[in-house]
Amino acid sequence: MDLIQPKDGPRTEYHKNGQKLTEENYKDGKLNGKWTWWYENGQISNEGNYKDGKRDGKQTDYYKNGQIREERNLKDGNLEGKQNAWHENGQISEERNFKDGNAEGKSTKWYANGQIEIEGNCINNRPIGKLNSFYENGLKKLEMNFKDGKRDGKETVWYEYGQIKEERNHKNDKLDGKQTWWYEYGQKRREANYKDGKLNGRTINGWYENGQIKEERNYKNNRIHTNWTWWRENGTKHSEMYYIDGMKRLKWTWWYENGQKEAEYHFKGFDYGTRDGRSTNWDENGQIEAVAIFKDDECISGDYDYFKDL
């Protein structure tokens, strides 16, 4: 059965075990004055004040053990001034400032062990300037910059024990410029270039332990454009595909370790399986082993049996 909301005076609700659940006051049909909520064990869970139906003044939330969880200040229903929160062990967990309901000034979060987790600044609810994030062991996890609420400039990410993980650059909240990733043991993992949030230019995916590049691609407006190349650890080229506008694969070439061309196939369109034009295979001495001419993936002349399963 629903409780009838009074126009004036108190309203009280109870838990099933008989303990008080809520106590609120009304004036002219609106919440007004002190309100309190309780846990089933009789411990206060929340308390605060209303003014003309809106939360106003200090509001406090508690853990079941009686420890304060959060203290908020409100004005006309909006957060105003300093807001604090605590871990259940009593250690402060968060400190923020608000103006007219918007985050304003410095904000800090802490781990339960007292170590800072995040610290940054806001103006009118928008992050601005440097934001730092830390691991629970105290080492830095993230450093980034904001301008007018958007990511701008260099951003750095670290692994838990101090090794650099990522280095990114933003402009107007979009990736822009060189971006670099590392493995936890320090070896560079990937390197890419962006413009206005899209891959543009050279991207390297992996290096051998001796520093030799494993794979390299070129992009234009987020699509593979021109060469996609693989190398062996000794620096010789293994294979290379040539693209136009992303998936239009036009040519695929392989090389032997001695540098001699092993095979070269031509394609057309977006379909990976559509061979079109000349397909050639060589032996390690540069002598042609087989040649065929394809049109729309059908062999129209040459050594079909050699190429049919390729």
Regions found by a protein language model. Give the residues of each.
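Glycine/tyrosine- and acidic-biased, solvent-exposed loop/turn segments at the edges of beta-strands
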Residues: 1-310
